[in-house]
Design a protein with these regions (language model features):
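Catalytic-core segments of class I nucleotidyltransferases/pyrophosphorylases
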Residues: 92, 99, 108-112, 126-127, ...
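Conserved catalytic core of nucleotide-sugar-dependent glycosyltransferases
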Residues: 131-142
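Short, structured coil segments at secondary-structure junctions
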Residues: 16, 61-63, 138
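N-terminal nucleotide-binding beta1-loop-alpha1 segment
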Residues: 1-14, 188
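Residues at the starts of beta-strands that form the adenosine-phosphate
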Residues: 42-44, 90, 117-118, 160, ...
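Conserved N-terminal catalytic core of the sugar/cofactor nucleotidyltransferase
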Residues: 22, 26-106, 171, 204
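A short, conserved acidic/glycine-rich loop-to-beta-strand motif
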Residues: 114-124
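Short beta-strand/turn micro-motifs composed of small residues
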Residues: 2, 48, 95, 122-123
Length: 216
């Protein structure tokens, strides 16, 4: 997911997309793409928005198979309005602003352990200064998401989901919070165990500089 405008990172995003900001001598999105290219995946897709042509050109050179223009759309729009809606298989969802060590073997094992749910969020331990949706669970079933009711875990931005299953059991929604709300009501939103690999989210210029120091 790389269509965000990145307003909180102005002026760095005045003339480029958030995904194309320089991070440790590479593009911010390149941290994940480099890892994904080494995995046995059927395809890699990205969403683009602001300065989408520039990002799409870079992504294709980096081995991305599908580009979806979601400019001025919500972050879940692609799931109901592109060919991915027909995908009846696990789809790993990442955000371009995460600095994360992708342990696909662990994520896949968690997905199978929880009986291949419609949607599974990957929680992390909260990091000071980084906002997130706090997750309340009962036997790994998510019963509430909140920005104010603090819990020991919150969403990392990493999910594994089945687009066709989601289309079959929810009404169209533009943003993930509305999708998750529908799934919670049907007891279909699951949380994995807490992710312990490297994870950091970049939403501001200060966080970018912090990440550069932490993950050089």
């Amino acid at each position: 997911m790389a269509a965000g405008r990145g307003l909180r990172m102005m002026p760095l995003t005045t003339n480029t997309s958030k995904a194309m900001i320089q991070f440790n001598n590479a593009m911010l999105i390149g941290n994940s793409l480099k890892q994904l290219k080494k995995l046995d995946l059927q395809s890699i897709s990205i969403t683009v928005g602001y300065k989408g042509a520039e990002l799409a050109e870079y992504a294709i050179k980096e081995g991305v198979h599908n580009i979806f223009n979601t400019n001025e759309k919500g972050n879940a729009w692609w799931m109901y309005n592109t060919l991915l809606k027909q995908l009846d298989a696990p789809l790993l969802v990442l955000t371009c602003d995460n600095i994360v060590e992708i342990d696909l073997e662990w994520i896949s094992a968690q997905y199978l352990k929880h009986n291949s749910p419609t949607c599974m969020l990957i929680p992390v331990t909260p990091v000071d200064g980084i906002e997130g949706d706090f997750i309340q669970t009962k036997n790994n079933q998510i019963i509430n998401l909140s920005r104010t009711e603090k819990t020991p875990i919150y969403g990392s931005g990493i999910q594994i989901l089945n687009p066709k299953k989601i289309n079959d059991c929810t009404e169209k929604a533009d943003n993930f919070y509305d999708v998750w709300t529908q799934l919670i009501a049907q007891e279909l939103l699951i949380a994995s165990e807490t992710y312990t690999k490297t994870w950091y989210s970049i939403n501001t210029e200060a966080q970018l500089h912090t990440a550069e120091k932490l993950y050089t």
